[in-house]
Amino acid sequence: MKVNDRVTVKTDGGPRRPGVVLAVEQFSEGVMYLVSLEDYPLGIWFFNEMGHSDGIFVELAE
């Protein structure tokens, strides 16, 4: 995923929420995405762990 991609994010117990990627940071354990959400227009960070499906919080929107 890259900046300006439309995504959905997994949050605690609720439905996936739509957003837009504002920034991407690569790490050895995975990738951090700064995602603008309706409640957080300036963005909130989400981490996608590599190799662990439970650790995937950001996905491309369909």
From Swiss-Prot:
Pfam families: DSRB (PF10781)
Species of the source: Enterobacter sp. (strain 638)
NCBIfam families per record: PRK10708.1
HAMAP family, sorted: DsrB (MF_01549)
Family: Belongs to the DsrB family.
Protein's recorded name: Protein DsrB
Superkingdom to which the source organism belongs: Bacteria
